Amino acid sequence: NTDIEYRKALCGPTYLGPSTKYFNAYALANAEAIYDGQRSVNPDDRVFLLTRSGFAGQQRYSTATWSGDIGTRWEDMKAQISAGLNFAMSGIPYWTMDIGGFSVENRYMAAKEGSEDLREWRELNNRWYQFGAFCPLFRSHGQYPCREIYNIAPEGSPTYQSMKYYTELRYQLMPYIYSLASKTHFE
């Protein structure tokens, strides 16, 4: 990893001014360009951009941020709580994560039915799913193994039933979520 001050020194001036003042503002300009381009082609369609880069103010371009390709460990799930709070405190109301983590440990990929690793994989995904149901965007995504609930746990199992419950709860919360989204946009 390169020192941040060295990276800033390597950057040339930006359209807005010196790179040291506007470092990382690329995300805002990128979101604006995509938004304006989509609106110019299809002015009556809603634009939605999901990006891993973030900068204050990008929400005005219908942009949501996700925390990137994170690992599949308990500490990775824990880190998403502070990541979400940081997004929100930065004025970015729409954020998400790869529920269950993106980069899966080999022990989970190779787990056999009845193994401790498979039990832990299911528990981790279940807890992450429960947390994700209350986040602004509910998105289960990642590398193999597949993330559909029927691929994580057998139908009828406690893990499956829990994940199904939180999926249904999320849909029950949609009027509330849409109302908050509208309030965020208009107020």
Regions found by a protein language model. Name each.
Residues 1-187:
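Catalytic-domain carbohydrate-binding cleft regions of carbohydrate-active enzymes
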